Amino acid sequence: MSFATISVIGLGYIGLPTAAAFASRQKQVIGVDINQHAVDTINRGEIHIVEPDLASVVKTAVEGGFLRASTTPVEADAWLIAVPTPFKGDHEPDMTYVESAARSIAPVLKKGALVILESTSPVGSTEKMAEWLAEMRPDLTFPQQVGEQADVNIAYCPERVLPGQVMVELIKNDRVIGGMTPVCSARASELYKIFLEGECVVTNSRTAEMCKLTENSFRDVNIAFANELSLICADQGINVWELIRLANRHPRVNILQPGPGVGGHCIAVDPWFIVAQNPQQARLIRTAREVNDHKPFWVIDQVKAAVADCLAATDKRASELKIACFGLAFKPNIDDLRESPAMEIAELIAQWHSGETLVVEPNIHQLPKKLTGLCTLAQLDEALATADVLVMLVDHSQFKVINGDNVHQQYVVDAKGVWR
């Protein structure tokens, strides 16, 4: 069965680029999202997120009649579910959005359809999704019931793209294809080859699920080493960035760069999925998460120390001091604030500091709700000219071009080493 019509559930940072990639190959693509604003924006040929090169692809696809968005699912040959999978309680995975998406498409599933889960999920989620679909559609058969002879094929195919490079990596990167059966994997591979230039690497659904969690946990553990090293160096009076540069001259050493913490909806979340399912075995993974989660509070302590030094050296009161936070996004040159340690730090500073807290974030036009009324969104020049204490949190390109020698403030907390 060919894939004449493809539907993507969830039109966020992964779903919309994926929908656009299929539409760019002149496939009929229906994007589904519960966010009416996102749907309306896309149907105008515009985008509601920041991602290089995405706007032009969406505009061309919509104008050509290959991409449209809706708030309700309609019949399609293939479905891709790319909805959030946050955690709840004690870092337990919350599969509510995946279940809701699966149950929303069940009424319009047809024999021969392919359903792919892309959302980062704990091991066994694809099988659980298949159970939800089977529960709602007893008239159809699924892989867990009849194997290769199933009416509906099910697979897990995680994305592995870098925000800011999504439109390139979506097409160029290899793709892990985890079907519930070999037939499911073959059909999923056929679907992705519509736009994929990388290789489709086939495995089973459980291994594919664990693969995505492993990739991000590996990154988290390595970042935790760098962040822990930064704490040690601060106590020892050593420039951690110089230290890492020197250590990395060793041919078999590649230490990552420290920062204010770890953010985003992948690296800051996925390791907990492994810990939740394997609490006794995942001790290193848990410790790395705790190290990275603690880093924002260490940054806050540095800010408090800088403010105390500033007050001691000037005749200003605390309420007269301005603190400027540079960056809110979880990584450079994007507008994604999910799980961002920079935003957490800005919020904590604003709650603690009696004076004005400025925020400079060149990729947004208004503050998120949790910072509205707490902080002031400022331009870069204004913050540099008026703030008493500077806090560098995200190494956006606009910040990196500023020569540290031209920063006149004596009280600087640089969590990214931009002005080192």
UniProtKB/Swiss-Prot annotation:
UniProt keywords, alphabetically: NAD, Oxidoreductase
Single Gene Ontology MF annotation: NAD binding
Keyword Cell wall biogenesis/degradation: no
Catalytic residues in the record: K212, C266
EC number: 1.1.1.336
Coiled coil regions in record: none
pH influence on activity: Optimum pH is 10.0.
Binding residues annotated for UDP-N-acetyl-alpha-D-mannosaminouronate, in chain numbering: R160, V161, K212, N216, R219, H250, R252, G263, F330, K331, K416
SMART domains: UDPG_MGDP_dh_C
Any Pfam family the entry gives: UDPG_MGDP_dh
Domain of life where this protein originates: Bacteria
UniProt key word Protein transport: no
Catalysed reactions listed for this entry: UDP-N-acetyl-alpha-D-mannosamine + 2 NAD(+) + H2O = UDP-N-acetyl-alpha-D-mannosaminouronate + 2 NADH + 3 H(+)
Reported consequences of knocking out the gene: Mutants do not synthesize Und-PP-GlcNAc-ManNAcA (lipid II) and enterobacterial common antigen (ECA).
Stated regulation of activity: Activated by N-acetylglucosamine-1-P or K(+) at low UDP-ManNAc concentrations.
GO CC term, one of those recorded: cytosol
Biological process terms in GO annotation: enterobacterial common antigen biosynthetic process
PANTHER family referenced in this protein's UniProt entry, alphabetically: UDP-N-ACETYL-D-MANNOSAMINE DEHYDROGENASE
Protein family membership: Belongs to the UDP-glucose/GDP-mannose dehydrogenase family. WecC subfamily.
HAMAP family per the UniProt record, alphabetical: WecC_RffD (MF_02029)
Listed name of the protein: UDP-N-acetyl-D-mannosamine dehydrogenase
